[in-house]
């Protein structure tokens, strides 16, 4: 027997609520990013721009986006300030039509919603009442590697930062050794690409030894610098 959710394709709809990017029927997409201050939603025309009339394509993609945004707000239970970056539309009538489409799409939402007009920068601000923690808040945790930033420093940048910290520790009184416990890729970079810089620190500080310790259980950007 086919599960009921699978039969009506509900599983795929639930899964879409966990994705940063949601595809639109025309080939465009919406990208949803939540921050401490607000939720930003960007409309991307992508493949939809292959149509002949760019203005009409932008208008139709924005209409699709308005429907999908209203749906995603309910699915994810997003609240607070929401800023939508619609694809630029020149005719004012198109802007008003998209605003009205969004207002119509959110009418069935039980949360209280306020919607502004599209600004001359193509941005629409709206607010949605917080009824409960959002889907992201209740089912996600902060990434232990990047601490929620979404990016980590590259090996070169991180290695240079560690070198500066090693020298700071080496300058302190009564320091005999400085141990840098680092991820394997960082250790490889320091010992191969920056060996001369490590040796220079030892030379400048006289009796201080710098020991690079690779740790295969550690990932960038994490490291530890200890003086002995």
Regions of interest found by a model, annotated:
Residues 1-228:
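DE-rich acidic low-complexity regions and acidic surface loops
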């Amino acid at each position: 027997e086919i599960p009921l959710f699978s039969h009506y394709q509900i599983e795929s709809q639930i899964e879409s609520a966990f994705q940063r990017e949601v595809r639109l029927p025309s080939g465009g997409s919406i990208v949803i990013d939540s921050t401490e201050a607000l939720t930003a939603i960007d409309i991307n025309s992508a493949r939809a721009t292959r149509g002949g009339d760019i203005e009409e394509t932008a208008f139709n993609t924005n209409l699709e986006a308005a429907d999908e945004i209203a749906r995603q707000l309910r699915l994810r239970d997003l609240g607070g300030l929401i800023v939508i970056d619609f694809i630029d539309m020149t005719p004012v009538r198109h802007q008003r039509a998209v605003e009205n489409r969004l207002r119509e799409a959110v009418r069935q939402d039980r949360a209280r919603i306020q919607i502004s007009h599209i600004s001359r920068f193509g941005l629409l601000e709206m607010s949605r009442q917080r009824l409960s923690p959002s889907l992201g808040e209740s089912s996600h945790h902060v990434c232990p590697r990047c601490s929620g930033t979404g990016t980590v420093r590259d090996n070169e940048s991180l290695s240079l930062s560690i070198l500066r910290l090693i020298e700071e520790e080496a300058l302190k009184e009564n320091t005999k050794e400085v141990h840098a416990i680092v991820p394997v890729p960082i250790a490889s970079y320091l010992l191969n690409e920056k060996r001369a810089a490590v040796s220079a620190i030892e030379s400048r500080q006289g009796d201080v030894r710098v020991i690079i310790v690779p740790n295969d259980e550690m990932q960038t950007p994490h490291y530890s610098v200890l003086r002995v």
